[in-house]
Amino acid sequence: MVHPVQVGKRTRMSFSRLKEVGQMPNLIEVQLDSYDWFLKEGLQEVFDDINPIQDYTGNLNLEFVGYKLDLDSIKYSVEECKERDSTYAAPLKVKVRLLNKETGEIKEQEVFMGDFPLMTEQGTFIINGAERVIVSQLVRSPGVYYDMTVDKTGSKLFSATVIPNRGAWLEYETDSNNIIYVRIDKTRKLPITILARALGYGTDAEIIEFFGEDERLKATIEKDNTKTREEALLEIYKRLRPGEPPTVDSAESLIESLFFDAKRYDLSRVGRYKFNKKLAIHLRITNQIADQDIVNPQTGEILVQKGEKIDKDKAIEIQSCGINEVYIKIDDKSFKVIGNHFVDIHSLVSFDISDLNIKEYVFYPVLKEILDNYADEESIKEEIRKNIYRLIPKHIIREDIYATINYELALSYDIGYKDDIDHLGNRRLRSVGELLQNQFRIGLSRMERVVKERMTIQDQEVITPQALINIRPVAASIKEFFGSSQLSQFMDQTNPLSELTHKRRLSALGPGGLSRERAGFEVRDVHHSHYGRMCPIETPEGPNIGLINSLATFAKVNEYGFIETPYRRIDPKNKRATNDIVYMTADEEDLYVIARSDEPIDENGYFIDDKVTVRAKEEVLVVPVSEVEYMDISPRQLVSVATAMIPFLENDDASRALMGSNMQRQAVPLLKPQAPIVGTGIEYKAATDSGVLPKAKNAGTVVYVSADEIRVRRDSDGGIDKYKLLKFKRSNQGTCINQRPIVSKGEVVAKETLLADGPSTDLGEIALGKNILMGFITWEGYNYEDAMLISEQLVKEDVFTSIHIEEYEAEARDTKLGPEEITRDIPNVGEEALKDIDERGIIRIGAEVRSGDILVGKVTPKGETELTAEERLLRAIFGEKAREVRDTSLRVPHGEAGIIVDVKIFTRENGDELPPGVNKLVRCYIAQKRKISVGDKMAGRHGNKGVISRVLPEEDMPFLPDGRPLQICLNPLGVPSRMNIGQVLEVHLGLAASKLGWHIATPVFDGAIESDIVDCLRKAGYSEDGKTVLYDGRTGEPFDNRVTVGYMYILKLAHLVDDKIHARSTGPYSLVTQQPLGGKAQFGGQRFGEMEVWALEAYGAAHTLQEILTVKSDDVVGRVKTYEAIVKGENIPEPGVPESFKVLIKELQALCLDVKVLNDDNQEIKLKESVDEDADELEVNIEGTENQPEEKEEKEKEDSDEYDDLREEDVEPDLEELSLDDLDLDDFGDEH
C-alpha cells in the first residue's frame, strides 16, 4: 500500500510494492572508472607494448621506464579554462632510459610528452574552453565467430571469421561441394588444407592423422593442388604478395609476421578471453560420449571410460590435465575434438598466485615446461612473471588456428554452436580509457619511427633521450582525438538529464564501428541480451535509430568491456531468494533461468506460487520453482534513466515512450523549477549523479550561506570548506546555469549532502517542467492537430519563463594595413547609438540592447589611396588623424535582444593567451527572459507534444466548479490513437495528490495501479472517474459533458519560436548566382521554388512572377534600381537580365558551345561581364549590413549541432538549396 519514502529533503508517498535489493551504481561511473583505468594501467600497457625501441643495428636501446601526470602544475582550474578557451590538462612526464650496448653507458632523463587532457569530476573534458564528452562505442568483440547458412539443396554450410583487435582476418567458408576454403586478410580464397600445411602439417597423411577422418577434409585435400609444406607456403605467398618472386624463406617470414608477431597482430585481453571461451576443450566435450578411454597423461589414471558420458566437472578435469585431443562418439562415428591447449592455471598451481593478476587461461605447454623445471614457489612465480607473454599470448598461435579449423569441422556433427553477432556477449564497449589508449598507441608508434631514424643519423656518443624523442606526433594524435573524433562530442547541456544521458550514451558509429548506411535492420533491433544492459526504449528517431543507445540504470561495464547487469541469487537448496547480488554478462546470463523481480515472495524470500514466470534466453516460460536459479533485482533495471523518469511507463505505447524519453532531454531550465507531483522516485538519484549540484566533501556544520558561497566547518579538524556557487553562467546550449543554496546556517551536513540546487532541480530532485492544471477539452478549434491552448496566467506569473544567455565576441587583429582598434570613436555613428558604450568602446554591464545596437566599437584601417598634394600637406600639418578607417563594430544580430550580464576582456598586455595576430578579445554575454508565447513547443512526459496556438485571457478559460480556471486545454483526440494512456493516469493521480498535498513516487513497472488511483481520488473527495463539470469562461454555462481534469507535468522544450522566426527585406546575396542566401543564420530569404512557380503560372499572375524571378531575386541592377524607385516614390523600372541567365550562358560556353544572345534584328546583345559600374552610379547599398553575420555565430551553430548524434562531417547541407522550412528539421530528426 502507499507508504512514505524520504528522498533528500522531500518526502514522497510511494506506491512501490517491492523492496529494493542492492544499490543503483553511480550513474557516470562508465566515464570515471574508464579514465581512471587509463591513467593507472592503460598508459603503462602502451609503453610496455612499445618497449624497447632499438635502432637497426640493435646497439641503442630506448626504454620508457615510468610516467607520471604532474597534477601540481595544472595551469588553470576548470572554471578558468572555460573562461580562457584553454584545455584542462596536466603535463605528462615520462622517465626514459637510453642504453648504449657497445659502451654499456646508461642515460636517464625525464621527458615532457605534452599536456594530457584531464577528466573533470563530472566525467567531462574541457577542450579549448568547451565542455566535451567522449561517448562510449559499441563494437564487435575480437574473437572467433561461426555462422551457418542453408543452400538451395538444403545442406548446411558453415563459415567462420577470426577477428583480431588489429591484424589480418581469417575467414573460413564451405561451398556446396563440401570443400572448406580460407581467405587470409580478405584476399582470394584458398583450400583450408593449404593453411594447415603451411603451419606445419605438410603431407596429406599428417593432416588426416592430426584432424581425424572427415568427409569435408578429404574433399578439400582432393581440391588442394599442393602436396608439401613448401608448396603450400609458396602458394600462400603468391596470393598475398602477387608479383613478387616467391621463396620459402620469405613466405615463412610473411606468415610469421602476419599472425605470430605481437606488434602486427593483437588480440587484446578480450580477444584472448573470447578465444579461450569458444575453443577451450572442456566446453566442447561436456555431455558428449567418449569413444576411447581418456587417460591422465601424468598419472595414467583413467578419467573417463569408453562409452561413458563426460559431465561438466570431468570435462574441466580433462582440460586441466593438459589433454588437448578427445575422441567422442557421434551416431556411430568417431570424431576428434581438438582444443587450443589453454588451461586454468589455478587448478595446476597449488599455491596462491593472486598477486600475479592472471585471470585468463594460460598456454599449457609453456606452463608445463615451467612446472617441470622449477619446484619452489618463488622461482615458479618468477618464471611465470618472465614468461607472461608466452603464457597469455597477445597474438594468435598455431594451436588457436588448428582449434578453429577443428571447430568448423565439428559443427557439421552438431558439436559447438553458431554465434549471433548482435548478442551483447559478442559486442563490447570501448569507453574513454580504451579509445584514448588506442589513440595514444597510434601517436607512440609514429614517434617510434622518428626515434629509429634519429638513432641512425645522430652521433651515438653524445645522443640523449631528449634529443631522440619528438613528442609532436603523440601530442597531435591526442589533440586530434579530442578535437575532431566522431566520438568526442560537444556536451549536451540543455538540462541535467541531458548531461547525464550524454555521458551514458552508447554509439555503434564512429571509427572502427558501423556506418549509418551499412547498418542493417538486425543491428538496430532490440535483442533479448539487451535486458538490463541497454535501454530498449531510449534511442533517437531518424537515421540513427538503434545505433545510438543508452545504458540501463543498473548496468556496469566489466574489465573486458562487456556490459553486466545484476541478479539476485536463489539459494539452490531451499529455493529462497537471497540478497546475494551477482553481476552477469550476457553470455553468462544465457546459461540460467531467471525470474522476474515482481514475482511474489514472502518476507523470508520464499516464492509464494509453485509456478514462476521466467526468462530463458529469448523465451518467456512458466516453470516450477525448483528450476529457478536467479531473479531480477529491480523492475526498472531494463530501462535507462530518462525512461525510468516516465510515470506509468507500463501504460504507454513504446514509440510514444521513446519520444517522451527523448523530449525530457530537451526541456529548458525554467526560472522557478518545480519537482513533479507525480514522480517515479529516480529524480533524486539522477540529479545528484549528473554532477550539476555541489555536494559536501566532508561532514560538518554550515557556518555561512550567501547566494554565491557556502562555507562548512569540518567535523574532523575544524577547518573550513568553501563552495563557490555558479551564478547565471551560460551552458553549451545557451541555457542558464544558476545554483541556489538549500542549506541554512547552523545546519549539520553529512558527507555527500547536497548543498545547493542547480538548473532544473528542486530540493535535489530533477525538475524539468511544471505541474499544470489541465483538462482534456476542445476549445473553438484551437486544439486542432495537437495544438495547445494556454491561459494568460502562465505568461503573467512567469510559470514557463526561462533565461537564455548568448555570447558574442569581437577581436582586434593586426591587419596588413595596421592594427584594428577597439574604441568609442567610430565614424558616422551618432551619440545616441553610443549612450551605453564606455570610454573604452565596450558596452556597460546592465545595458539593455536591441538588434543592431553596438556592443563593441571597433575600427579597421582602410586601404591607403594615392594622396593628392593638398591632402599630403594637410596630413603633414595635422598628423595621422585623417587616416581612413571603416566601422567594423560588433553589433547585436537580427532578432536578438536582452540585457548585458557580463563582459570579459582579454589583452596581450595582461598576459592572456590569445591566438596569433589577435591583440584584444572582448566577450559580451546577453541574457534574455523568454516568456511562453504562441509557437513555442511544449510536451508532457509521455510523448504528447504540441505547439501553443493561442494565449487566452484567464477569464475566458474553462473553469472548475470552485472557480479555478484551467491553465492548459489539451485535445482529447490526442490520446486514443497514440495509446499513451499513462498521461491520463498521471492526470488522475495528480488531481488527487495535489488535493492531499502529497508528492508521489510511482516507479516504472511497480507503480500505482487503477485501484490505487481510485482510492486516492476517493480519499481526496473527487468522483472515481476523475471527471468534473467544467464551465465556459465566456458564458458561465456548463459544458455538455463532464471532463477529465487534473495536474499534468509539462515541459517547455528547447524549440523556441524566438529562435526560429525570421524575416528579411534585403540582405546578403550568393556570390555566383546573386540570389539571396537561405536560412536564418545567413539572414536569408524564403526560397520560391519550382512548384511555387507553377502555382503562380497556373494563376496567370504574370507580373508577380516576373518580379519574383528578377528584381526580388538575382537581377542585380534591377533590384537596386527598384529599391531606389521605391525610396524616391517613382514608378518601378523594367526588370533586366537575371544573373542566373548569364550563369547559364557561361556554363554552355564552358561546354565549348558558341552561345550568343540575339535581339529581333539578329544583333548580338552584349551581356555585361560585371555590373559594378552600374551599381556604383546608383550609390545605394541594399545588402543591409555590408558584412555578413559574424563567424562566431556560425561556430556556435556548428557546436550545437555537433553532439547531434555524431553527425558525419560530410553531410553539409547546401544552404542555398534549402528553404527555412527544410532547415527547421522535423521536430525530432535525430534529437534536436
From Swiss-Prot:
Swiss-Prot/TrEMBL catalytic activity: RNA(n) + a ribonucleoside 5'-triphosphate = RNA(n+1) + diphosphate
Gene Ontology cellular component list: DNA-directed RNA polymerase complex
Biased composition (Acidic residues): 1171-1180, 1199-1232
Biased composition (Basic and acidic residues): 1189-1198
Pfam families: RNA_pol_Rpb2_1, RNA_pol_Rpb2_2, RNA_pol_Rpb2_3, RNA_pol_Rpb2_45, RNA_pol_Rpb2_6, RNA_pol_Rpb2_7
InterPro entries: DNA-dir_RNA_pol_bsu_ext_1_sf, DNA-dir_RNA_pol_bsu_external_1, DNA-dir_RNA_pol_su2, DNA-dir_RNAP_su2_dom, DNA-dir_RNAP_su2_hyb_sf, RNA_pol_bsu_bac, RNA_pol_bsu_CS, RNA_pol_bsu_protrusion
Family as reported in the entry's similarity comment: Belongs to the RNA polymerase beta chain family.
Quaternary structure and interacting proteins, as annotated: The RNAP catalytic core consists of 2 alpha, 1 beta, 1 beta' and 1 omega subunit. When a sigma factor is associated with the core the holoenzyme is formed, which can initiate transcription.
PANTHER family, sorted: DNA-DIRECTED RNA POLYMERASE I SUBUNIT 2
Role noted for this protein: DNA-dependent RNA polymerase catalyzes the transcription of DNA into RNA using the four ribonucleoside triphosphates as substrates.
Entry protein name: DNA-directed RNA polymerase subunit beta
Source organism per UniProt: Clostridium botulinum (strain Okra / Type B1)
